């Protein structure tokens, strides 16, 4: 299990991660999504002890990373495949990792076969394509037969066949009781792979839960002949929205606080006529992601523009 509680980090007094709490259960794959600069990588680095949080805690199997006697046996991680020594061979890279983890080096041959780079095992990592380095990085994460995996953009450089292979590997790992936390910018791949989802925007979690629940009618479309008045009413009620198709506004309903009944009440209280109020038809994770991470609470004038 991987958990964080109110993780917070600032650089030069600028917050980059704000009170991030998440829980990744054994037997599940959790997708960690956010735009570039949203705080994903910093959060992952805090979980594995590479960055010290200003506040908050992170644990893996009930312990902080620095308290784990042999971390590689508990959690495997791939944060930057390009960081591997370019002058070593693939086999040498894994052999060193196995020895550091106090693992039988015979496991190296199994992992080379598992990730599909046995034929290139004697080649220097510096000659590997990005996809091959990603495969090697995944093998390195698995060296200690860990209970959890933390992967930052593991599909980078993989071709469609490689992505399908990775999906199968992670699903098998989770089905055997492992915990997987992965970040990715490939939304369709996260939708095909993950069971749970955590979305971060501007350093803060904006949605978390089972993927199928979050995708089920996660937004509400509302429209009025007077979009400026409608936007002002939502703004006054502290309800975030983004401009939708035409003059419609789209409201995030994934958290359960905002419902169609609530929106109808806001319109009634502000004497705004509504001509449309409906759950939107989800177009999958892409629509959900952009509705959650788009600029929130725009001014009424911006919404009407």
Regions found by a protein language model. Name each.
Residues 126, 187, 248, 281-282:
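Conserved beta-strand edge residues that scaffold enzyme active sites
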Residues 62, 72, 90, 202, ...:
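ATP/adenylate-binding site constellation spanning eukaryotic-like Ser/Thr protein kinases
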Residues 2-201, 207:
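ABC transporter nucleotide-binding domains
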Residues 255-305:
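C-terminal coupling/interaction segments
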Residues 101, 238, 293-297:
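Conserved NTP-handling cores and scaffolds of large molecular machines
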Residues 166-254:
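ABC transporter nucleotide-binding domain
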């Amino acid at each position: 299990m991987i958990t964080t509680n109110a993780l917070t980090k600032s650089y030069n007094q600028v917050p980059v991660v704000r009170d991030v709490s998440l829980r990744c259960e054994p037997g599940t794959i959790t997708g960690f999504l956010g735009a570039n600069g949203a705080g994903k990588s910093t959060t992952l680095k805090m979980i594995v002890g590479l960055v010290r949080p200003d506040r908050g805690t992170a644990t893996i199997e009930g312990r902080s990373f620095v308290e784990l006697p042999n971390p590689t046996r508990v959690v495997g991680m791939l944060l930057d495949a390009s960081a591997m020594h370019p002058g070593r061979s693939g086999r040498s890279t894994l052999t060193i990792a196995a020895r550091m983890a106090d693992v039988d080096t015979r496991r190296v041959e199994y992992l080379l076969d598992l990730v599909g780079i046995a034929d290139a095992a004697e080649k220097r990592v510096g000659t590997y394509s990005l996809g091959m380095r990603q495969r090697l990085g995944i093998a390195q994460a698995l060296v200690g037969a860990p209970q959890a995996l933390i992967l930052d953009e593991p599909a980078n450089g993989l071709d469609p066949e490689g992505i399908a292979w990775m999906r199968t590997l992670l699903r098998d790992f989770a089905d055997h009781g492992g915990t997987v936390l992965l970040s990715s910018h490939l939304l369709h791949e996260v939708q095909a792979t993950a069971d749970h989802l955590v979305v971060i925007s501007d350093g803060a979690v904006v949605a978390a839960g089972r993927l199928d629940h979050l995708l089920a009618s996660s937004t509400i479309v509302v429209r009025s002949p007077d979009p400026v008045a409608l936007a002002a009413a939502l703004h006054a009620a502290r309800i975030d929205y983004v401009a939708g198709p035409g003059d419609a506004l789209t409201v995030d309903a994934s958290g359960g606080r905002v419902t169609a009944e609530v929106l109808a009440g806001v319109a009634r209280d502000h004497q705004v006529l509504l001509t449309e109020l409906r759950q939107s038809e989800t177009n999958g994770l892409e629509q959900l992601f952009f509705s959650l991470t788009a600029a929130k609470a725009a001014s009424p004038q911006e919404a009407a523009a």
